[in-house]
Regions:
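Solvent-exposed soluble domains appended to multi-pass membrane proteins
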Residues: 1-222
Length: 222
């Protein structure tokens, strides 16, 4: 069925918790708002524990430091054996591109993993805000149909540029897994999903530009 993410522009850790543990965070009331800190210590069942019980190595990869939102402790509580953050992978405090994350994952896993594995990888390049550094609009690949104004079109172009970068990073991991399958005969599953809706083009406040005028009437009823 469909995977429905939780919010506009926030709550990454909620989606992480729900996809790993399989529980709706809302059943825990206010504690469900900060799952890594408030709920993770009580987890004793998850997909990571399940995969370990069936002979899989489990690992998690962060594009940021492990202290961010208590991520390292939380993922240990969720059952992951190996947890590598940006500093563990030699990338400093923060990885700027998803390509960096994908390359670091391939390096850490190695060209020929000896056992089946389950890895949870976080990308962050396409997170808002989508301010861009372009000086003019001549290089924009796409524009809004209803306005030639620079600010919204610049953000749209930046959003799509980063999306293309993310697509390339995902493809590199797919190629990596396909190569392992060719050499070992072990098939793979690659699941890609977003953690929440982009805040940049919403009308939920927090941005100096209101994109509400570009939304369809049907969209406003959702």
């Amino acid at each position: 069925g469909l995977l429905r993410v939780n919010a506009m522009g926030g709550g990454t850790w909620i989606t992480e918790f729900e996809t790993i543990v399989g529980l709706d965070s809302r059943v825990f009331g206010y504690s469900g708002m900060y799952t890594h800190a408030s709920l993770s210590p009580f987890v004793d069942r998850s997909i990571a524990f399940y995969m370990r019980q069936h002979g899989y190595r489990t690992s998690a990869f962060f594009p940021h430091g492990g202290d961010f939102y208590n991520a390292r402790n939380a993922y240990a509580n969720y059952g992951f054996e190996t947890i590598l953050d940006s500093e563990d992978m030699g990338r400093g405090a923060w990885m700027e591109t998803d390509g960096e994350v994908a390359a670091s994952v391939r390096t850490a896993m190695g060209p020929a993993p000896q056992a089946p594995f389950f890895s949870y990888v976080l990308f962050i390049e396409n997170h808002s805000p989508h301010d861009c550094g372009a000086g003019d609009s001549t290089g924009f690949a796409v524009r809004f149909a209803d306005t030639q104004e620079f600010t919204p079109n610049c953000a749209l172009d930046e959003y799509l540029r980063r999306l293309d970068s993310t697509t390339s990073a995902v493809q590199s991991l797919q190629d990596y897994l396909a190569d392992i399958e060719t050499r070992t005969g072990r098939p793979f599953v690659l699941l890609v999903f977003g953690d929440h809706q982009p805040h940049t083009f919403a009308s939920t406040g927090g941005f100096h530009y209101d994109y509400g005028a570009f939304r369809k009437v049907a969209d406003t009823r959702m």
